[in-house]
Amino acid sequence: MAENKRTRWQRRPGTTGGKLPWNDWRNATTWRKATQLLLLAMNIYIAITFWYWVRYYETASSTTFVARPGGIEGWLPIAGLMNLKYSLVTGQLPSVHAAAMLLLVAFIVISLLLKKAFCSWLCPVGTLSELIGDLGNKLFGRQCVLPRWLDIPLRGVKYLLLSFFIYIALLMPAQAIHYFMLSPYSVVMDVKMLDFFRHMGTATLISVTVLLIASLFIRHAWCRYLCPYGALMGVVSLLSPFKIRRNAESCIDCGKCAKNCPSRIPVDKLIQVRTVECTGCMTCVESCPVASTLTFSLQKPAANKKAFALSGWLMTLLVLGIMFAVIGYAMYAGVWQSPVPEELYRRLIPQAPMIGH
């Protein structure tokens, strides 16, 4: 009687029960969460500093002055998109909110190379959404999964929002964008954004509350269905050379990769993950118990040869390196801060609630 052949597989080095300990330097999830917390802390600092800067002008200089944080430009994606159109047409950096455009370009480059890594490694909204989802999972023991007939149309909403903003940017001539960026509204655009959060109306409060509650039950509700920024990164990420790739020969069909994927991608059924929903978070890679089976790489992993694959520490180095390189360029070029005279800020910021488009 012929002896049945058993599939032999090699356990991923350092794993216990198929997982690496959280404090193992090879654990990609630990590197990602550390990067997320760093960016979240930076954005909290930016928000607090910006609030103090605005209050200085609102109180007629009676409070402590702090310099305007240039990082607030990262919260002006529409200005960044419009300025990107202006720069592509004219070949020049915009005079106001150039940093918003450069940060947008940095995040596009990250998505172009590393899938939607901006969403899962850098975005503070994505981090908060993930934390809320984790809380919901601990409180209720599970996450809701919407049926396909509802999930697919809802995922299309963020692309409709993205199309609207791209249409606005494409519709405006470069000269019109230039004049708009010099307008009083553009100068205090960041202050208007702060006012939106400081003085929420009833409808906005209800919407935010519903979204927060939904995020407890539906993982990444905002990111999956409504975020136009993530939609843009997803479209760009289709060109990414790095993808999650699976070696079907060594795969033991345990299904852990698909079960743990926060985007609910059936990784265990695919040879390479092309979908716009993949954020490059590497959760599936960390869930795989078999060596050389699931990688975030340029080519399919193989048991008999080493393919170049991205590790957690290298992903951290790349996403932070690209972002800080662009910030460094903005500082070197003198556009990290918009060249707005202090007297103009002194006059416009107290009037910001009354300034329209």
UniProtKB/Swiss-Prot annotation:
Gene Ontology CC annotations of this record: plasma membrane
List of residues binding [4Fe-4S] cluster 2: 261, 278, 281, 284
Residues annotated as binding [4Fe-4S] cluster 1: 251, 254, 257, 288
Gene3D superfamilies reported in the protein's UniProt record: 3.30.70.20
Periplasmic side: 55-91, 182-195, 333-357
UniProt xrefs under PROSITE patterns: 4FE4S_FER_1, 4FE4S_FER_2
Cytoplasmic compartment spans: 1-36, 115-158, 219-309
Isomerase listed as a keyword: no
Transmembrane segments: 37-54, 92-114, 159-181, 196-218, 310-332
Annotated keywords: 4Fe-4S, Cell inner membrane, Cell membrane, Electron transport, Iron, Iron-sulfur, Membrane, Metal-binding, Repeat, Transmembrane, Transmembrane helix, Transport
Lipid bilayer topology: Multi-pass membrane protein
Localization of this protein: Cell inner membrane
Domain of life: Bacteria
Pfam families attached to this UniProt entry: Fer4_3 (PF12798), Fer4_5 (PF12801)
One annotated GO molecular function: metal ion binding
InterPro entries given in the database record: 4Fe4S_Fe-S-bd, 4Fe4S_Fe_S_CS, NosR_regulator
Residues covered by the 4Fe-4S ferredoxin-type domain: 242-270, 269-299
Protein name in UniProt: Putative electron transport protein YccM
Species of origin: Escherichia coli (strain K12)
UniProt lineage: Bacteria, Pseudomonadati, Pseudomonadota, Gammaproteobacteria, Enterobacterales
